[in-house]
């Protein structure tokens, strides 16, 4: 296949899964709104996903379940060769590993969120890209 100048075959590019994570109120959704059109991405907002499945369990088990759910939703988009941007707290190394992002954007903009239980369990990421 020969590509003409300024022509790109999207089948040659692997779709990516981008996680925007941080404490509640750190600006995750604000950044996601800006990046989604730039990357022509499917947007997974954790609050909207929780609302859709009516699962408001924020215990460690509930958060693991949410990370797995977000991973499964993202995989459906990746299977269609669509980029994915997911914005959610993803408070522990384990939930971040469960989600399995290609890139992590840490919104390190606040030191405490509005939910004390989340503040207590939040682990700053050891690895992030931006």
Cite the ranges covered by each PLM segment.
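Hydrophobic anchor at the beta1->P-loop junction of P-loop NTPases
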Residues: 20
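P-loop (Walker A) phosphate-binding loop of NTP-binding proteins
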Residues: 23
């Amino acid at each position: 296949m020969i590509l003409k100048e300024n022509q790109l075959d999207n089948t040659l590019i692997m779709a990516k899964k981008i996680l925007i994570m941080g404490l509640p109120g750190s600006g995750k959704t604000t950044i996601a709104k800006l990046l989604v059109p730039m990357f022509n991405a499917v947007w997974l907002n954790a609050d909207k996903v929780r609302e859709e499945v009516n699962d408001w369990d924020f215990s460690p088990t509930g958060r693991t379940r949410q990370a797995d759910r977000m991973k499964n939703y993202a995989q459906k988009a990746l299977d269609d060769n669509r980029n994915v941007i997911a914005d959610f707290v993803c408070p522990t190394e384990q939930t971040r590993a469960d989600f399995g992002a290609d890139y992590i954007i840490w919104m390190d903009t606040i030191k405490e969120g509005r939910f004390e239980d989340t503040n207590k369990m939040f682990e700053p990421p050891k690895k992030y890209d931006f």
